[in-house]
């Protein structure tokens, strides 16, 4: 592996992942720190509850694009490397960590679900569609974004395996899935208590 190249790609992926679209939307539209409202997250769900559908859609698309960019960057610069898939794995992990712990916001960001969607699309689009279907079914049944995200994250490594994706991508699904579930630990507590809000509720996600 070309370590200087890999480290540069991973650093760029972290910085891209850490771009705080939700925070900037809050500052631009209402001059608020969105982390002080709702769930305290900078992600699209909290933006939806705090700022409305239009800003939430824009933040969602931007966060998905961050994931796509990280994979594109890794594949473009390291595509010819024998270790290219492993560099993509590192870029993916760096992007989700950047979104959750952005250097620009004192390491307090979102839960990395949307950026992970972009990463899955860039790595293996059939897996992305399968995981999206899992999310969609769970959300349709419960109307709870966090529950759908947790189940989809847990299903991601299995989806990579069933689609016979390269080992580094399956490993990303495992590590990234565990990370996202861990980021939702507060939501899990509320789910167990029966207090986790559904979409449309004023309470925080």
UniProtKB/Swiss-Prot annotation:
The record's InterPro entries line, in alphabetical order, gives: G3P_acylTferase_PlsY (IPR003811)
- Report the record's Gene Ontology biological process terms: phospholipid biosynthetic process
Q: Please list every transmembrane segment annotated in the UniProt record, as residue ranges.
A: 5-25, 54-74, 87-107, 117-137, 138-158, 162-182
Q: In which pathway does it act?
A: Lipid metabolism; phospholipid metabolism
Give the EC number(s) under which this enzyme is classified.
2.3.1.275
Q: Which SMART domains does UniProt cross-reference here? A: G3P_acyltransf
An example of a GO molecular function for this protein is: acyl-phosphate glycerol-3-phosphate acyltransferase activity
Pfam families assigned to the protein according to its UniProt record, in alphabetical order? G3P_acyltransf
Tell me which HAMAP family the record gives.
PlsY
Entry function: Catalyzes the transfer of an acyl group from acyl-phosphate (acyl-PO(4)) to glycerol-3-phosphate (G3P) to form lysophosphatidic acid (LPA). This enzyme utilizes acyl-phosphate as fatty acyl donor, but not acyl-CoA or acyl-ACP.
NCBIfam families attached here?
glycerol-3-phosphate 1-O-acyltransferase PlsY (TIGR00023)
Family designation: Belongs to the PlsY family.
Its protein name is: Glycerol-3-phosphate acyltransferase
- Give the species this sequence originates from: Gloeobacter violaceus (strain ATCC 29082 / PCC 7421)
């Amino acid at each position: 592996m070309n370590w200087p190249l890999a480290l540069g790609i991973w650093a760029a992926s972290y910085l891209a992942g850490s771009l705080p679209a939700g925070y900037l939307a809050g500052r631009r539209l209402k001059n608020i720190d969105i982390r002080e409202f709702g769930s305290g997250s900078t992600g699209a769900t909290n933006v939806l509850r705090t700022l409305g559908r239009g800003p939430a859609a824009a933040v969602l698309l931007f966060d998905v694009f961050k994931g796509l960019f990280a994979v594109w960057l890794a594949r473009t610069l390291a595509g010819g490397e024998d270790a290219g898939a492993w560099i993509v794995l590192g870029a993916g992990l760096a992007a989700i960590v950047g979104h959750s712990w952005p250097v620009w916001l004192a390491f307090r960001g979102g839960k990395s679900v949307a950026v992970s969607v972009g990463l899955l699309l860039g790595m293996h689009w059939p897996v992305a569609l399968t995981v999206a279907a899992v999310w969609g079914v769970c959300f349709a049944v419960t109307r709870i974004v966090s529950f759908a995200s947790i189940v989809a994250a847990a299903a991601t490594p299995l989806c990579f395996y069933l689609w016979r994706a390269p080992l580094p991508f399956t490993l990303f699904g495992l590590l990234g899935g565990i990370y996202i579930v861990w980021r939702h630990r507060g939501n899990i507590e509320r789910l167990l208590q029966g207090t986790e809000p559904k979409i449309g509720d004023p309470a925080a996600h």
